[in-house]
Regions:
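Accessory RNA 3′-end/elbow-binding domains used by RNA modification enzymes
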Residues: 1-12, 16-33, 37, 41-44, ...
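Phosphate-centric recognition/catalysis
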Residues: 47
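Short, charged/polar surface micro-motifs in flexible loops or helix N-caps
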Residues: 50-53, 74-75
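Acidic, low-complexity central loop/insert segments
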Residues: 58-113
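Long, charge-dense, solvent-exposed interaction surfaces that engage phosphate-rich ligands
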Residues: 107-129
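Pseudouridine synthase
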Residues: 125, 130, 156-197
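Short aromatic-glycine motifs in intrinsically disordered, low-complexity regions
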Residues: 130-139
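Helix-hairpin-helix/helix-loop-helix acidic hairpins
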Residues: 142-158
Length: 273
């Protein structure tokens, strides 16, 4: 079975554990997801079954939109509602100050990834080192914040909706916001609403071609040449400029790259749903 769809991951379970459930549900051995959701987080998880797992590098997943809630006065080593270390009282915030801080934290934002994350450190995952109590530092990175708005504030809980680039950590954004407001805080809830055009629709199977924005090309000879993976020449394509292209056939599609007047297959014979 080949399929591409959006699942709704519940809070309290890892993305890998949730994927195992889906594999049993659909009776498949090969499956994958794009964009890990932390165990405490819920929402949109792009899932592919079978050979469609090869598509993750080519589908459009930006911007990513989240709904997040901060717990003011709480601190956590993992920057979420797990591993809570301390809870202190803090005075209510001025709404104007909160909105001003959010307004300043737009555009390209520098941040430090959470130590409880899947980042690699000397060949190991950062969360493995953090759980083992080892000392290490992660390098500053940048995220693109396209938009962010306050959605609710009932002290000590402050909620916002944020649109960010792929690979961003909303937990780290919340730490930047807390620092700007002069308080300690951690995320108590996080929901991913969408990734690009991907939204949850009861696991409806999707047409991958609707989510790949590569320019289209045409093979001007016998489609069987592509089906058999034969070597292609630029002269046999409608467009010969360098770049990545999608070639669509009746039963399948392929992704090719033209570089230095040479055509190479990036993906071939991807069956349609």
């Amino acid at each position: 079975m080949n399929a591409l769809f959006v699942a709704n991951k519940p809070a309290g379970i890892s993305s890998n554990h949730f994927l195992s459930r889906l594999k049993r549900k659909y009776g498949v051995k090969k499956a994958g997801f794009s964009g890990t959701l932390d165990p405490f987080a819920s929402g949109c998880l792009i899932v592919a079954l079978g050979n469609h797992t090869r598509l993750f590098n080519y589908i459009d997943k930006t911007p990513k939109i989240y709904e997040a809630t901060m717990w003011l006065g709480a601190t956590s080593a993992s920057l979420d509602n797990e591993n809570i270390e301390e809870i202190t009282l803090c005075p209510p915030l001025n709404l104007a100050d909160v909105k001003a801080a959010l307004g300043e934290l737009k555009g390209e934002i520098a941040y430090v990834p959470p130590k409880f994350s899947a980042k690699h450190v000397d060949g190991k995952r950062a969360y493995e080192l953090a759980r083992a109590g080892e000392e290490f530092e992660l390098k500053n990175q940048t995220m693109s914040v396209f938009d962010v708005n306050l959605t609710a504030y009932m002290h000590p809980f402050l909620s916002f909706r944020i649109s960010v680039s792929e690979g961003s950590y909303v937990r780290s954004y919340a730490q930047n916001l807390a620092a700007k407001l002069g308080v300690k805080a951690t995320l108590s809830a996080l929901k991913r609403v969408s990734e690009g055009k991907f939204v949850y629709e009861n696991e409806r199977f999707l047409n991958p071609l609707d989510y790949i924005s590569l320019p289209r090309n045409e093979y001007l000879r016998d489609p069987a040449d592509v089906m058999l993976g034969k070597k292609l020449s630029v002269e046999k394509l409608k467009f010969g400029a360098e770049g990545l292209y999608l070639i669509n056939f009746d039963e399948f599609f392929s992704i090719i790259e033209i570089k230095d007047e040479t055509v190479t297959y990036k993906l071939n014979k991807v069956e349609k749903c």
